[in-house]
């Protein structure tokens, strides 16, 4: 009788405590294809933060920021965007250029280079499509629907591109704060 009671108390009080401690907020849940891509660049994959971007009443996309430490800033991170509606390639490229121009005034040759890079990085987007941007020190690698679509070492482009979502004075400070994990209690 005492053995059964002792075993019951262990199961009720001790084991759940262990599971609570091992279930951290920064574990990531992704499909296997995304995990395979991330495994090529990260030994550990910890969630810094996640956010949902909405414009008026449209649910545009969900974003996650991943690093090996679970902290940002980092020289190595992944930004994952899962789209919640369809977008044309042209509209995504145009809006991305608009966001980049809020950070820098481009001369004509610079703007043409940016357009070339963005046209290589983006495709027509369907609901639930996934875009992964990985900053790996001095280079960036972009995946669309598990296909590597762009690799660049253009540091200015890399920083401006990721700063659309990550800079302190972004267009949507609440979104950026959530993505950077600043809303954790």
Labelled PLM ranges:
Residues 2-24:
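Classical Sec-dependent N-terminal signal peptides that target proteins to the secretory pathway
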Residues 21-144, 148-185:
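Terminal leader/tail segments of proteins
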């Amino acid at each position: 009788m005492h053995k059964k009671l002792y075993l019951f108390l262990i199961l009720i009080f001790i084991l759940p405590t262990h599971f609570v401690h091992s279930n951290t907020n920064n574990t990531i849940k992704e499909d296997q294809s995304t995990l395979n891509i991330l495994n090529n660049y990260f030994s550990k994959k910890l969630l810094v933060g996640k956010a949902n971007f909405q414009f008026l009443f449209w649910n545009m996309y969900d974003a996650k920021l991943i690093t090996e430490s679970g902290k940002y800033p980092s020289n190595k991170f992944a930004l994952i965007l899962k789209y919640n509606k369809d977008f044309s390639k042209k509209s995504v490229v145009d809006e991305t250029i608009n966001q980049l121009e809020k950070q820098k005034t481009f001369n004509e040759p610079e703007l043409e280079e940016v357009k070339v890079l963005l046209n290589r990085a983006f495709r027509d987007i369907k609901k639930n499509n996934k875009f992964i941007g990985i900053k790996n020190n001095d280079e960036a690698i972009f995946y669309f629907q598990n296909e590597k679509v762009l690799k660049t070492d253009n540091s200015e482009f890399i920083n401006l591109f990721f700063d659309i979502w990550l800079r302190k004075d972004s267009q949507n400070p609440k979104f950026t704060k959530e993505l950077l994990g600043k809303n954790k209690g």
